[in-house]
Amino acid sequence: DVLINNAGLWIQEELDTNDSKRINSVVDVNLLGVINCSKAVIPIMKKNKDGLIININSQAGINHKAERVVYNATKWGVTGFCKSLADEVAKYGIRVTNVMPGMMKTDMFNKMNIQKNMANGIDTKEVARLIKFIIDTPSDVMIPEVGIKNINN
């Protein structure tokens, strides 16, 4: 069984000007969504003594930047969650991988009316190829963390 957690919301402005409802939404989707979906599948994976949880996180989970305080906090939270969960469930044959792409060529920023130069973004197909590689890895091999980005980013 494989779970791929791949949902996220972006928020970019100074903390004191952020709307509290928007902050809660970002935390709910980016961090609590990962935790709750993982929690839901672990009993099945434990029973099967096998499983793979892949969390599509972000390089924001190891970096920091002004005006991305909330977004980065959620992504750092996912990074810590992945590492701790991997330690917790390895004894049941469950693997956990933290995938941290750099800026990806998606329409997320356009939908939010944020101007971003996507020329140095990574194509989503490359991230998909990486995920397929992780899934195809033998069940006794874990890839705990991997970053992927455009060479010019």
Predicted features along the sequence, with ranges:
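Active-site loop immediately N-terminal to the catalytic Tyr-X3-Lys motif
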Residues: D16, N63-V69
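Active-site-adjacent segment of SDR/Rossmann-fold oxidoreductases
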Residues: N63, S84-I94
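C-terminal helical subdomain
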Residues: I94, N98, K116-N153
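Substrate-binding pocket helix/loop in short-chain dehydrogenase/reductase
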Residues: E14-L15, D19-V27
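Active-site helix of classical SDR
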Residues: S38, T74
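Conserved NAD(P)H cofactor-binding loop of Rossmann-fold oxidoreductase domains
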Residues: A7-I11
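Residue(s) in the substrate-gating loop at a strand-loop-helix junction
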Residues: S58
